[in-house]
Amino acid sequence: MRLEFSIYRYNPDVDDAPRMQDYTLEADEGRDMMLLDALIQLKEKDPSLSFRRSCREGVCGSDGLNMNGKNGLACITPISALNQPGKKIVIRPLPGLPVIRDLVVDMGQFYAQYEKIKPYLLNNGQNPPAREHLQMPEQREKLDGLYECILCACCSTSCPSFWWNPDKFIGPAGLLAAYRFLIDSRDTETDSRLDGLSDAFSVFRCHSIMNCVSVCPKGLNPTRAIGHIKSMLLQRNA
């Protein structure tokens, strides 16, 4: 089976502007490999092709890409989901972030927004307790669907609000984590966390477009979490 690709290429050291480059790959009939497998084979032919990868199991979040116009992880996206008769598989870097080279983007702004929400437990500056903080099962269950994020940035880079205000809007990934700590029974800084999210941009630039839900490789729902944060802010200010 002959696979055809159109891949975004840009090397700032030698290129004046980005371009799309065509590749072909012969694949075994009946064998459905993942896109990352195909990219690795293409890189064997063209060592200049750059992309990120690590675990190859959908755990590390390193290989987020835009594939046929939709964000996702290359390592868990089968070629059969992308290949259409008579059409090329179009691969681009995650949108909305500066391109370092080819399919590698600068994640600095994404991580900066994530850092703003203080993604760790706070306890009023007290010394760590002598033993772990205990939780009831129902308290722990509230965190399901919130802690599993792998920071691949597929959600935030699919969000128009993040494209338009990347330095002000926290983004879906950061706000999902923010809600995870807001409702954690072991955290004592709910008010200060809400203070940090109370401006006009951090949370309320989310317009519930739900691109983030559509592309999340872990099946999480950042839009729902953001809605809960909005409710907490509005109730506090009522």
UniProtKB/Swiss-Prot annotation:
> What Pfam families does UniProt report for this protein, alphabetically?
Fer2_3, Fer4_17
- Which residues are listed for [4Fe-4S] cluster binding in this entry? C149, C152, C155, C216
Associated pathway = Carbohydrate metabolism; tricarboxylic acid cycle; fumarate from succinate (bacterial route): step 1/1
Q: Which UniProt keywords apply?
A: 2Fe-2S, 3Fe-4S, 4Fe-4S, Cell inner membrane, Cell membrane, Electron transport, Iron, Iron-sulfur, Membrane, Metal-binding, Oxidoreductase, Transport, Tricarboxylic acid cycle
**Transmembrane portions of the chain:** none
Membrane topology term: Peripheral membrane protein
Enzyme class per UniProt: oxidoreductase
- Name the chemical reaction catalysed here: a quinone + succinate = fumarate + a quinol
**Which positions bind [3Fe-4S] cluster?**
C159, C206, C212
Question: What PANTHER family does UniProt report for this protein, alphabetically?
Answer: SUCCINATE DEHYDROGENASE [UBIQUINONE] IRON-SULFUR SUBUNIT, MITOCHONDRIAL (PTHR11921:SF29), SUCCINATE DEHYDROGENASE IRON-SULFUR PROTEIN (PTHR11921)
What is the stated purpose of this protein? Two distinct, membrane-bound, FAD-containing enzymes are responsible for the catalysis of fumarate and succinate interconversion; the fumarate reductase is used in anaerobic growth, and the succinate dehydrogenase is used in aerobic growth.
Q: Which family does it belong to?
A: Belongs to the succinate dehydrogenase/fumarate reductase iron-sulfur protein family.
The protein here is known as Succinate dehydrogenase iron-sulfur subunit
Which source organism does the UniProt entry give? Escherichia coli (strain K12)
Organism lineage = Bacteria, Pseudomonadati, Pseudomonadota, Gammaproteobacteria, Enterobacterales
The primary gene name is sdhB
